[in-house]
């Protein structure tokens, strides 16, 4: 499968080019979905990794050898075929970047599920690391630097992730030397009509929270910048800065009041006062209330070498260095899945308790 099809050209409308390229790829892939009924013949199902209204994620080992994978199953009675194909196609096209979770093999369908394989993150998701307190400064920097690179990669291909949150950041080692952004289910070409979130979300920017049905806004990279700023705050403090970026949320009102007061008070309101000036400047840019002047994700690198004032700045092993990536490098990954079956329903029930190592929500 051609994996750089979503790159845009210098001529023509970039947003239209990306949308058309993705649509063509979805149509092409639709004829290549493999209908199968013998999952347990091809894979040993180890345990359930996560589940939700979308379906479930399973840890599986190919019976003929190869890497352990996370199998994402989407219920056919609740997910449109085109939605499934779009997520798979986007995942395959951007899998060359180490900051984005690899999508592997071929798309499949059983009588109950659409399915595809992804690389398995053995340390779970970022939310599992934030149960009690924020992370040391070095780890926070590693995380946001890798995510900033991943988002810039997506944005350079005319795509917006639109669902950046701790649950969707997969962790590959305890020191966060590699993390990857997963769940591309809401990823769309830039400019796609986007409504308000169906439920209040702390990661949604105010311009979307203010929308009333049936109004929409064109999807912009600034949505990801805002969510990256919220995620930075979460990684540093183990909590969200607000419940929703909308009045009358008191935490958001305090932040917005400080951001809009002229001249701006020298000291920000709590809990923002725990950040050193370089980190605070970064957060002010990523969380700019005006999406037109909001900083891009790569603004992270402007202050990466500065002191952010976070706890445990001397903790953590190794250097700040993260996995390098050079645009243009391609890596084919994963083995295709050949056989599927709905017999997994009974086998999954016997495979042990649910663990949150990988999430698909």
UniProtKB/Swiss-Prot annotation:
Q: Where is the composition biased (Acidic residues)?
A: 328-348
Q: Where does ATP bind?
A: 49-57, 72
Sorted alphabetically, the keyword list is:
ATP-binding, Kinase, Nucleotide-binding, Serine/threonine-protein kinase, Transferase
- SUPFAM superfamilies the record matches: Protein kinase-like (PK-like)
* Catalytic activity, as annotated: L-seryl-[protein] + ATP = O-phospho-L-seryl-[protein] + ADP + H(+); L-threonyl-[protein] + ATP = O-phospho-L-threonyl-[protein] + ADP + H(+)
This entry's Enzyme Commission designation comes to 2.7.11.1
Q: Give residue ranges for domain Protein kinase.
A: 43-309
Active site positions, chain numbering = 163 (proton acceptor)
Tell me the InterPro entries matching this sequence: Kinase-like_dom_sf (IPR011009), Prot_kinase_dom (IPR000719), Protein_kinase_ATP_BS (IPR017441), Ser/Thr_kinase_AS (IPR008271)
Note the PROSITE patterns from the entry.
PROTEIN_KINASE_ATP, PROTEIN_KINASE_DOM, PROTEIN_KINASE_ST
MF terms from GO for this chain are: ATP binding; protein serine kinase activity; protein serine/threonine kinase activity
| Record's compositionally biased regions (Basic and acidic residues) | 349-361
Region entry Disordered: which residue ranges? 312-361
Q: Does this UniProt record's set of keywords contain Transit peptide?
A: no
Its family remark reads: Belongs to the protein kinase superfamily. Ser/Thr protein kinase family. STKL subfamily.
This one is known as Uncharacterized serine/threonine-protein kinase SBK3
Task: Provide the species name.
Answer: Mus musculus
């Amino acid at each position: 499968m051609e994996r750089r099809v979503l790159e845009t050209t210098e001529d023509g409308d970039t947003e239209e080019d990306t949308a058309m390229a993705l649509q063509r790829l979805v149509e092409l892939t639709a004829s290549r979905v493999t209908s199968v009924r013998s999952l347990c013949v091809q894979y040993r199902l180890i345990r359930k990794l996560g589940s939700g209204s979308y379906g479930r994620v399973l840890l599986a080992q190919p019976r003929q050898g190869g890497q352990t994978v996370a199998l994402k199953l989407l219920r056919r009675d609740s997910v449109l075929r085109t939605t499934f194909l779009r997520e798979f196609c986007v995942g395959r096209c951007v899998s060359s970047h180490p900051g984005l979770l690899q999508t592997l093999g071929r798309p499949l369908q059983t009588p109950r599920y659409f399915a595809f394989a992804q690389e398995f993150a053995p340390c779970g998701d970022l939310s599992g690391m934030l149960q009690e307190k924020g992370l040391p400064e070095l780890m926070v920097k590693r995380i946001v630097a890798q995510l900033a690179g991943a988002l810039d990669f997506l944005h350079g291909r005319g795509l917006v992730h639109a669902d950046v949150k701790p649950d969707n950041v997969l962790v590959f080692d305890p020191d966060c030397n590699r993390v990857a952004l997963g769940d591309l289910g809401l990823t769309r070409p830039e400019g796609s009509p986007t409504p308000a979130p169906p439920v209040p979300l702390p990661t949604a920017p105010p311009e979307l929270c203010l929308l009333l049905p049936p109004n929409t806004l064109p999807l912009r990279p600034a949505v990801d910048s805002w969510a990256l700023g919220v995620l930075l705050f979460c990684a540093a403090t183990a909590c969200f800065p607000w419940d929703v970026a909308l009045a009358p949320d008191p935490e958001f009102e305090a932040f917005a009041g400080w951001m809009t007061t002229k001249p701006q008070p020298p000291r920000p309101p709590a809990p923002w006062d725990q950040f050193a000036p370089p980190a605070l400047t970064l957060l002010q840019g990523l969380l700019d209330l005006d999406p037109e002047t909001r900083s891009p994700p790569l603004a992270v690198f402007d202050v990466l070498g500065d002191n952010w004032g976070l706890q445990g700045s001397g903790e953590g092993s190794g250097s700040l260095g993260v996995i390098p990536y050079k645009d243009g490098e391609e890596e084919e990954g994963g083995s295709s899945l050949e056989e599927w079956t709905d017999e997994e329903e009974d086998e999954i029930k016997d495979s042990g308790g649910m663990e949150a190592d990988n999430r698909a929500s």
